[in-house]
Design a protein with these regions (language model features):
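One-carbon transfer enzymes
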Residues: 1-137
Length: 137
């Protein structure tokens, strides 16, 4: 199932109650910007996965998302960027890396160009990696 929720439901435990009531085994986040509460991490150890639009640990952490990441990659003159699919832990973008792949960043690339390349990686690999992870449950 796919569930929408309010930030307050994440913070007050309502979401966790819903997930456990539905007997959810695995949680998939996509560019999720909020910190997951410790209690939820305890109930779902190594079973909450997220995707980040850079090659972590570069360009990760609180406040690094979307175009901010791609702008930083271009500003730093990076030769490559990519995606990281990782397990959520109690720190922003520091969980165990499940999968990474890269794309070249050309000297002529704009942040929008990099974003397009990274989105293509996300569309291709995120569903595949999720399927592989679920098959191992």
């Amino acid at each position: 199932p796919c569930e929408s929720f309010l930030k307050s439901e994440l913070e007050d435990g309502t979401l966790l109650s819903k997930l456990t009531a539905e007997k959810v085994d695995f949680v998939v986040l996509a560019g999720f910007l909020l910190k997951i509460p410790d209690e939820m991490l305890t109930v779902f150890p190594d079973k909450i996965v997220n995707i980040h639009p850079s090659l972590l640990p570069k360009y990760g952490g609180k406040g690094m998302y979307g175009m901010k990441v791609h702008e930083a990659v271009v500003a730093a003159g990076e030769k490559e960027s990519g995606i990281t699919i990782h397990i959520i832990d109690d720190h922003y973008d520091e969980g165990s890396v499940v999968f990474q792949t890269t794309v070249p960043v050309l000297p002529t690339d704009t942040p929008e160009d990099v974003a397009h390349k990274v989105h293509e990686l996300e569309y291709k690999y995120f569903p595949q990696v999720i399927d592989e992870m679920i098959s191992k449950l």
